[in-house]
From Swiss-Prot:
Signal peptide: none
SUPFAM superfamilies for this protein: VC0467-like
Upper classification of the organism: Bacteria, Bacillati, Actinomycetota, Actinomycetes, Mycobacteriales
Protein's organism: Mycolicibacterium gilvum (strain PYR-GCK) (Mycobacterium gilvum (strain PYR-GCK))
Name of the protein in question: UPF0301 protein Mflv_0850
Taxonomy, superkingdom: Bacteria
Length: 204
């Protein structure tokens, strides 16, 4: 996990390609990964340690309103204010990510755990009214994506995933944005060319 001591960690900065998985990096499904659960998925890595890797899919919105599940968090939830499908593991469990307001410091704030930059894990048992002054918004995920130790590394060696750095704006982007393509477009050549890969392969 990144150290929160550097105030620059809480600013938006350009996100270059990453060379290793760590908390705060993203896994983009490569074009050959066609399994429906993860095709064109963007996974934000929340934890990566000796026990394995945990992340949430950023671009899989559900039709379930946050208000119907966790009404106390509906006000802080960003549009479209629906639950997102974080992955195939424990769909009955909820996990929340939030983006800090610029200049806010999460250190010592009950209910927040710093991940990277301005992104924090939010304890859903906390009082949202107490956290609202320092959060731009939150997104709540049903379930998560997980890998045992060494499993993700094997998938990366197989070229299933592209490991990239994240910007705070990636985490709360609206579903109408093609997040997978947007992230690739900001990468250097030749990686940015993958952004032109068609969504519907039958039209290629």
């Amino acid at each position: 996990m990144a150290s929160p001591d550097d105030p620059e960690d809480y600013q938006d900065r350009a996100a270059p390609a990453a060379h290793r998985v760590r908390a705060g990096t993203m896994l983009l499904a490569n074009t050959d990964l066609l399994e429906p659960t993860f095709r064109r998925s963007v996974i934000y890595v929340v934890e990566h340690n000796d026990g394995g890797t945990l992340g949430v899919v950023l671009n899989r919105a559900s039709e379930t309103a946050v208000y119907n599940v966790l009404p106390q968090w509906a006000k802080l939830a960003v549009k479209p204010k629906t639950m997102f499908i974080g992955g195939p593991v424990k769909r009955d469990a909820a996990l929340c990510l939030g983006t800090l307001r610029v200049g806010s410091d999460p250190v010592g704030v009950p209910g927040l755990r710093h991940v990277q930059g301005r992104i924090v894990m939010v304890d859903l048992d906390a009082d949202p009214d107490e956290l609202a002054p320092i959060l731009e918004g939150v997104r709540i995920f049903a379930g998560y994506s997980g890998w045992t130790i060494g499993q993700l590394e094997g998938e990366i060696e197989r070229d299933d995933w592209i490991v990239l750095s994240a910007l705070p704006t990636d985490v709360l982007v609206e579903p109408k944005v093609d997040l997978w393509a947007r992230i690739l477009r900001r990468q250097p050549m030749p990686l940015s060319l993958l952004a032109t890969h068609p969504i519907d392969l039958s039209r290629n």
